[in-house]
């Protein structure tokens, strides 16, 4: 990160003018936001959505009413 002092046109110090350097995760990184993680997240979301639809078809009602009926 750069150091130094930045002032505006009125001579006031601007503490937020220096921004940190942006680092992009490499494609082979094992963590962080990258294409492989985003694809996995999307695929798992699709699997969960299909599982929810199949559960509703099998039970004949939504998942929340089914869980609520089991608790009472």
Swiss-Prot record:
Expression induction or repression: Transcription is highly up-regulated 15 minutes after a shift to high light (500 umol photons/m(2)/s), declines by 2 hours to low levels. Upon a shift to low light (50 umol photons/m(2)/s) transcripts are rapidly degraded. Also transcribed in response to blue and UV-A light.
Keywords, in A-Z order: Membrane, Photosynthesis, Photosystem II, Pigment, Stress response, Thylakoid, Transmembrane, Transmembrane helix
> Which BP terms from GO are recorded?
photosynthesis
Q: Which spans are transmembrane here?
A: 47-67
From the Swiss-Prot or TrEMBL record, state where the protein is found.
Answer: Cellular thylakoid membrane
- Which Gene Ontology MF annotations are present? pigment binding
GO CC, one annotated term: photosystem II
Q: What membrane topology is given?
A: Single-pass membrane protein
Q: Does the keyword DNA damage apply?
A: no
**Is Protein biosynthesis given among the entry's keywords?**
no
The entry describes its oligomerization and partners as: Forms homodimers that associate with PSII assembly intermediates containing CP47 (psbB).
State the family named in the UniProt similarity comment for this chain.
Belongs to the Hlip family.
Report the protein's function.
A high light-inducible protein involved in photosystem II (PSII) assembly and/or repair under stress. Binds chlorophyll and carotenoids, protecting against photo-oxidation during PSII assembly.
- By what name is this protein known? High light-inducible protein HliA
Task: Please tell me the species this chain comes from.
Answer: Synechococcus elongatus (strain ATCC 33912 / PCC 7942 / FACHB-805) (Anacystis nidulans R2)
Q: What is the organism lineage in this UniProt record?
A: Bacteria, Bacillati, Cyanobacteriota, Cyanophyceae, Synechococcales
